[in-house]
Amino acid sequence: MNDWQWLKNRLVNAKTKAVSFWLAQTTSTILDIAELIKCCSDLKNTSINGLVDLINQQEKLEFNLTRLKEIDGEDARQLFGIEGNVYKHFQTELSRFYKQTRKHFRETGSESLFLGLPVIEGINEFNDVFRAPLLYVGVKLKVAPRLERFWLEINREEIFLNPTIIGVEINKRNSLFKNNYDTTKVDINQALEIFRELEYQFRMPLTSELKSFSKKAKSDFNTEKRTNFLTNNVLLGIFDVKGDQLFQNFNEILNTDPDVLDELLKDRRDLLYDNREFRENFNLKGTYLFSHLDIFQQYAVKQAFDGDVIIEGPPGTGKSETIVNILVNLALNKKKVLFVSEKVTALDVVYNRLGSFKHIALFNASVASEKKRFYSQFADYESFFTDNFSKKDLVNEMPVFDGQWVDKILSEFTNLQNIYDTQINSGNQSYSFKEILSSFPILDVSYIKIKEHDRFDEWVRVFSSQVWLEKHLTYLAFKAELSKRWQNIDNFYALKDLLEKRKNIRVLCYVLDYFEQNNSIIKPKRVLLYTPTERGQKQLHQLQQDVAKYNSLQRFKSAAKFETIKLNLANKLAQNAKPFFFSWFIQTHAQTLLENLVQTQKQLVKAKQSYLSKIEQYVVSCKRILKATILANFFELYQTNKNELLDICREAKNPVLKEITWWFKKNFALLSKLFPVHIMTFESAALLTPNQRRLYDYVVIDEASQVYLERAIPILYRGAKYIIAGDTKQLKPSNFFQARAEYDVDEEFEDGNVEAAVHSTSLLHFLKNRSRILTLLKFHYRSDSANLIAFTNNRIYNNELIFMNKATADKQVFIVHDVIDGIWRNNRNLQEARDVVQRLEQLTQTAEYQKSLGVICFNKNQAELIEYMIDKQNNPLLNEWRDRVNAQGEYVGLFVKNIENVQGDERDIIIFSLGYDRSVNSYGPISKQGGENRLNVAITRAKQRIELFKTNRASDYNGLSSNSLGSKLLVEYLLYCEAMANNQGESLDFQATQKQAPKAKYELELENQFFNELELIFGEQFTIKRNVNEGAYSFSFVFYFNENPYLAVDFNPALPHSRKEVSENIIYREQFLKKRKWNLVNIWLDEWKLNPGGVLQKLRNCLTHSENEFEEI
């Protein structure tokens, strides 16, 4: 068994840094309201006892700030330590505090707002100094319009005895302790009695008067005397005491089943798993599609079903959409699922994307804050069932996708490749049909008469003979000579015929003598009284010689061959046989191949279109069966547990809503049947569900890089299998026991406590190399401009992301504002903050006001300064911008955050306030270990534009030679922004395009010819660029109109050789282009070569489209 004590120790040590254990002073999220209670509340008995009575008996505590107008001067200094207008001061403080609570709720789903009273302080036996409220009472803060009044609505369902101080004590003692505090009321004496059981004694105050909370340091406590005190302080603030339920769950697990940690965290790697083989053999069979996913998302969904999977989702790669589909797949396979995240925004996004199918999941981000929303889910479900139920829906068969479609497409590509690769033999040489198609000229080859193409080289040799030509000329000359000698050539032929038929010399001589005398040829049968003359014998000899020579020249007599050889010699065919062979083959022997080629290309387009059509139908079918499943879940429970089901559904109509924790646990079994998916925060899951092994079939955890390992143990414990999603290149967890707003001041990064948090092990980092499978999402969708993601893709993700510009992306993607007179002083830059706020006000007067916007600062003080200035301006347009939500109820307002708090956010426009000037050598959290991850999160939030405010030129900042990777990358990024803003981005090396296979010379020549023709015909109307690298992709040609990409052309596209390549490089490349609003057309080289007019018309048709819509052609 492994020793997991280090996990427990880290958990306990982190607890000692929580504001519910040690609170030195009030903060922006914790207010001292003791004097406000005495001066402004409607409480008659303003002692601690009077306040306790009110909490136990009344529903709210009201405050009238206008009473503060009567307090000034010395009273203000004595009561509040404030110079000036007390009323205005508290109006401002209340306004800021109210906004902090709303921001906290948006990010966590829980207000975590409590009254803390009284405060206990001292030193425990382990020398831990503690100072925090003894009791916590949940409240809701309500404010009047002009902040003249506010009130606290008391929630007696959330009363906690300080669980942190107790938890640290019993864990360090390694003892079992049962906290029997009655959480239905506030009882200070009972709370102190619980602490006395742990041997804590407190010196009590002399009176019950409420006291102001003073600032203290740990050094103020005497470690030798160890005196503990109780002070009648009252604090109002954000305290993460509900998160202590996870702490308790963890302790229960460790104490009752310590061996289970070995099982939960064991190395589950499948050493025999071949990811490449999985991708090659991948098909959708058995996987349901709730929406259109890219191929890497489909891989993740398929792999997730086997469980114990890590899904790495870099920024903007569709991680939430992937999770939605995973949840749907698990639900359709009748699995019980718990989906959790630290950020409620991540939960909201997933839940909202379920749309009208949301009844498959039960959503509860906050146990107490959203009762109405929680209970309304059941009433909505009943209405959905009533409106949609039909018994015929219960007999739907599960849809099945034909996994052979990719094979069919690959088969057509293979056929096409085989046709191109067909070897054509000319006799001595062999050529691919593709080369012949690409290179053949239009020549007159009608005179080449051969049946078999493999005899072409032999024909060339025979019909290119200069010797034969000369022999033919000799033949013609000799023939002329014969015609002259024998009066005409016909006489020669007759005499030749006689000579060859008659062997009698006397007869032959007689004929020749007669020919000489009469110039005619006789045919005697016999000669009786004739004696051959000497002349006759000479003529016979001459004839015999002429016939012999004539016969020897007979094979050179062909006039046709003579003309052919003349042509061949004139064309230098022997030296230039290839183009003639190519042209001759295409014209006389290629018909069958060409017909097969055209047919295959048609079949290929048809197969791709069919695949996409089937995918579309499959998504519809999957949604139909999901709807049927939702109805069936309700129907089955209606059949078996009708009364209980209807009671659940009608709970929302009760005037007083029941406590969710009690009600949820009471109905847990029924709710699990009704909703196969439960969506919760970590705290909600710990409070609502039993701390039971394998309570769910799967647990799905999002944003897991920000989750401490020990915090995740109780969630992992509840699941049989896990699916972990996140990004190891983003933020590691910050100390979640501290109020988020109090983390990351620059000075804090100098101490060891926060540095320890930076080195902490997140759930994602710990399990990454222990999970069964690791899968990566690659297609990047968030950034409209490739330049917004190119830097981080190159520097952080090693060019693994697939991205490109949207066809409609703005041209001005980076704007750099140089701040004049900016100075980094007291951890902030005042002038830069002014410039940022001024810019925000400018944008409210433009069309940009309709977009979403976020301001990201590189340290907390700068963020607080900018927020303070915005508050002070009180601009109605800025206020509306800050509060904006979309149609789904998701917060999309203007935010101001530091880099620690923006993971998971995205906005159309991101404004960076760097703050630092060139005098700085360390950039706070960016310069610490993991700073590159912080920078990565910050610079990947923008969808459309980044605006950078900085005081000096990028080259003036220190960091390029720093040992800190974060510092180095920050300065590199500043240089990058400047270059992009000045349209000098091409000088930077951020090549992300996938390598292309080299092209043959003949392919390049044809491509050049095609380009020249495009320029000639379309060049006046469009700008045409060739070999365009666009993000991760390259195109042969791109037509631009008004600098916008109008049409991309893949000329002679590379063919895939595997199923993986078909999916990743063909089908989903084209689908990605569609989502990026690019038009694409494929032009096959044979298409251009054989029918250039048709190709040009095809391009004209594409270019006449009035809108940029993708169309596969």
From Swiss-Prot:
<dbReference type="InterPro" id="IPR047187">
    <property type="entry name" value="SF1_C_Upf1"/>
</dbReference>
<keyword id="KW-0547">Nucleotide-binding</keyword>
<feature type="binding site">
    <location>
        <begin position="313"/>
        <end position="320"/>
    </location>
    <ligand>
        <name>ATP</name>
    </ligand>
</feature>
<dbReference type="Pfam" id="PF13086">
    <property type="entry name" value="AAA_11"/>
</dbReference>
<dbReference type="InterPro" id="IPR041679">
    <property type="entry name" value="DNA2/NAM7-like_C"/>
</dbReference>
<dbReference type="GO" id="GO:0016787">
    <property type="term" value="F:hydrolase activity"/>
</dbReference>
<keyword id="KW-0067">ATP-binding</keyword>
<dbReference type="Pfam" id="PF13087">
    <property type="entry name" value="AAA_12"/>
</dbReference>
<keyword id="KW-0347">Helicase</keyword>
<dbReference type="GO" id="GO:0005524">
    <property type="term" value="F:ATP binding"/>
</dbReference>
<keyword id="KW-0378">Hydrolase</keyword>
<dbReference type="InterPro" id="IPR041677">
    <property type="entry name" value="DNA2/NAM7_AAA_11"/>
</dbReference>
<dbReference type="InterPro" id="IPR045055">
    <property type="entry name" value="DNA2/NAM7-like"/>
</dbReference>
<dbReference type="InterPro" id="IPR025103">
    <property type="entry name" value="DUF4011"/>
</dbReference>
<protein>
    <recommendedName>
        <fullName>Uncharacterized ATP-dependent helicase MG140 homolog</fullName>
        <ecNumber>3.6.4.-</ecNumber>
    </recommendedName>
</protein>
<dbReference type="GO" id="GO:0004386">
    <property type="term" value="F:helicase activity"/>
</dbReference>
<comment type="similarity">
    <text>Belongs to the DNA2/NAM7 helicase family.</text>
</comment>
<dbReference type="Pfam" id="PF13195">
    <property type="entry name" value="DUF4011"/>
</dbReference>
<dbReference type="InterPro" id="IPR027417">
    <property type="entry name" value="P-loop_NTPase"/>
</dbReference>
